[in-house]
Amino acid sequence: MPLNSPERSPEPKTSSDGTEHNDIAAALPKRIGRVYLGREKAHGPGAIVLDDFFAATAAYAKLSRSHVPERVDSAADTLILCVETPLPPSRTVLHRLRETHARAGARVYAIVLGDAGCSANAMRGCAERIKDACLSLELAWGGALIIGDAWGLERALRTAPRMGFWRRKISEGTDRLVAAARSGLPVSECQLRAGASSPIDPDDLIDVSKPIPAWTMCIRRFIDNVTR
């Protein structure tokens, strides 16, 4: 699977005696857990984006000849939380995060998927609730990828090329989240260290609330209905 390079890895820093060191080496993920809050559809958009996240994580680790994090069900040092509409209340998020038995200080990154009727503000609000839940459980918030109208693109996510027209923005957003998770950094800090030229969200959000123009979504639905 061809992958587009997400962000350059943060550069090692140099100490006063001229010795290079990477101050985030100890924070690199070794055990990644997966939490799914949604419709539990095996081939739905949430499952597809999660699978793509883990595939990209493994691919970039191999390209850089670094450790491929182990996928675990408990005692994770990093959690990937996927949330789908209808967006869950805070108490549900808290309950599921407690169930993971994640290590103290574990980093949490979220993927929030909305349907056609879910606004960017609603998805941002959900990400904020997840952040609050993390802080109350003494987990470290890493940021979130928000994806709009995911169900309108469900078939494209399964069949279209990863960096083709229909999936490109979502794939690029996923790659940016992968870069942050692999670095053990919040999304905004990872982008700053990598020298990103795109605007940096102060709330550590990657906004793909409009993955394609609205008029092309109508075409996509027409194509899916005709070829179904």
Region locations from a protein language model:
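Helix-loop-strand module that forms the ligand-binding subsite of alpha/beta enzymes
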Residues: 16-25, 29-31, 53, 69-138
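Glycine- and acidic-rich phosphate- and metal-coordinating loops
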Residues: 36, 109-113, 146-147
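Acidic carboxylate-rich catalytic motifs and surrounding loops in phosphoryl-/glycosyl-chemistry enzymes
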Residues: 68-71, 145-150, 187-198
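N-terminal acidic, proline/glycine-rich, low-complexity intrinsically disordered segments
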Residues: 1-13
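Active-site/pore-lining binding-face segments in mid-to-C-terminal subdomains
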Residues: 125-186
